From Swiss-Prot:
The gene is recA. This is Protein RecA. Its main location: cytoplasm. Belongs to the RecA family. CDD domains: RecA. Keywords: ATP-binding, Cytoplasm, DNA damage, DNA recombination, DNA repair, DNA-binding, Nucleotide-binding, SOS response.
């Protein structure tokens, strides 16, 4: 009996060795034909954690769960007209440039306002802009930029404005059933692998349409077929809620609007979280406003009556004064922002200490240069 078991073990071992050798040979052939890394064991990957880039909004980073937009993924931002979709995308462009990356904007709607983009922090001198004549041209340009591997972010504004060439060449009233959907489906199949390989973030802005004859359920849908819905790792629904009235001389005029951004699909973190932000006209998302609100809820900023204080020091009476104080003190803003991110697990304690050390070193170096009488360039 023992001899029989031993013999069976030897056969199993021999068979296992042969299978392993066959697998190794197959992997070598695949690497030879398709390059190193074409097939790999998941545990061998150097970076298993999803890499992200901040959205430019603290509240949205928290709602996204991972701390920002995942790199190498497709993002869809949709909502009603004038809800703030392009504003959200432009904040991502500004953030990409802030981190030293290159951003491209495919303006299919031919409606980008350079002055507004600059007000949001976008370096318009460095922004790559394309205003294509047709949907195929716009998607082809986006594909070539992504394939280059040199672009960190590509924004397409919008999917609804990507008109197929056949529709442009035809007459108004001609029927082109499913033409745009087929174009988008083909584009998603071609672009998805390249986007993942180059770690480019691709943001597609989309509009809303109404389904005809829907009696029950949500009649709203997005144009361009279903392909984008499937391929997108994150889908954001942007809706403006109430108007924000001014103070003093502007008390009767609207200076912005409160906006809800709902994460309706998320492949890298739990979905259905909502970010509430203030979009101020001419300024974009109020970063100080969202920080004051979130930090107050976490008791990082203390609120007593109308007064806001931090570490025992009063920073303003009323939220507007607190926002103004943080805007005038960027180092304090960054310090509170880091504490909030650590609280939500978006930043490790060690990363926070490292960031604070770098900021401290920069301040010390500046003070040393001034003490030594070295001229500092503006």
């Amino acid at each position: 009996m023992a001899k029989k078991l031993k013999k069976n073990e030897e056969i199993t071992k021999k068979f296992g060795d042969e299978r392993r050798k066959a697998l190794d040979d197959a992997l070598k052939n695949i690497e030879k034909d398709f390059g190193k890394g074409a097939v790999m064991r998941l545990g061998e990957r150097a970076e298993q954690k999803v890499q992200v880039m901040s959205s430019g909004s603290l509240a949205l980073d928290i709602a996204l769960g991972a701390g920002g937009y995942p790199k190498g993924r497709i993002i869809e931002i949709y909502g009603p007209e004038s809800s703030g979709k392009t504003t959200v995308a432009l904040h991502a462009v500004a953030q990409a440039q802030k981190e030293g990356g290159i951003a491209a904007f495919i303006d299919a709607e031919h409606a980008l306002d350079p002055a507004y983009a600059a007000a949001l922090g976008v370096n318009i001198d460095e922004l790559l802009l394309s205003q294509p004549d047709s949907g195929e041209q716009g998607l082809e340009i986006a594909g070539k930029l992504i394939d280059s591997g040199a672009v960190d972010l590509v924004v397409v504004d919008s999917v609804a404005a990507l008109v197929p060439r056949a529709e442009i060449d035809g007459d108004i009233g001609d029927s082109h059933v499913g033409l745009q959907a087929r174009m988008m489906s083909q584009a998603m199949r071609k672009l998805s692998a390249s986007i993942n390989k180059t770690k480019t973030i691709a943001i597609f802005i989309n509009q809303l349409r109404e389904k005809v004859g829907v009696m029950f359920g949500n009649p709203e849908t997005t144009p361009g077929g279903r392909a984008l819905k499937f391929y997108a790792s994150v889908r954001l629904d942007v809706r403006g809620t109430t108007q924000i009235k001014g103070t003093g001389d502007q008390k009767d005029s609207s200076i912005g609007k409160e906006t809800k951004i709902k994460v309706v699909k998320n492949k890298v973190a739990p979905p259905f979280k909502v970010a509430e932000v203030e979009i101020m006209y001419g300024e974009g998302i109020s970063r100080t406003g969202e920080l004051v609100k979130i930090a107050s809820d976490l008791d990082i900023i203390q609120k007593a009556g109308a007064w806001f204080s931090y570490n025992g020091e009063k920073i303003g009476q009323g939220s507007e004064n607190a926002k103004r104080y943080l805007a005038d003190h960027p180092q304090l803003f960054d310090e509170i922002d880091r504490k909030v991110r650590v609280k939500f697990g978006l930043l490790e304690e060690s990363e926070e200490e490292s960031a604070m050390a770098v900021a401290s070193e920069e301040t010390d170096d500046l003070a040393l240069d001034l003490d030594n009488g070295i001229e500092i360039e503006d």
